[in-house]
């Protein structure tokens, strides 16, 4: 059980990016009114992919709404929640997630191990904000 969103975010990030999969990343990225918790620039199947992540311990509705808004500016948008919320997502929100298409769900165990329980569709046409361009152009 995570006591804070910060702890959830740190554990997830430590395990998600252990191999350096994110070429660029920014926490609290201003891609919309209010920030996305994390934005990454990655190469996946030989294509550039921009991801946004929202971390929540509770208030799943808010997380989904934020991720839905983020999805306009990225290829894939994710909510990242503790693993004990998995059944809640599958029982209560799965049909809504299918409807909005571009939002996926990742659950994280206390150890940091994570799994995708709902896969979003890749959005090809996105509104690229200036801060995402700046992030992409930063030197490694």
Model-inferred region functions:
Residues 1-34, 44-46:
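Acidic-basic catalytic patches of nuclease active cores, encompassing PD-(D/E)XK
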Residues 2, 29, 56-57, 83:
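Short loop or secondary-structure boundary microenvironments that flank
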Residues 12, 38-40, 49-59:
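Conserved catalytic cores of phosphodiester-cleaving nucleases, focusing on short active-site segments
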Residues 34, 49-51, 75:
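A generic structural signal for short beta-strands and their flanking turns/coil linkers
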Residues 41-43, 108:
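A generic structural motif
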Residues 57-108:
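Catalytic cores of nucleic-acid endonucleases
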Residues 99-140:
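Non-catalytic C-terminal interaction segments of nucleic acid-processing enzymes
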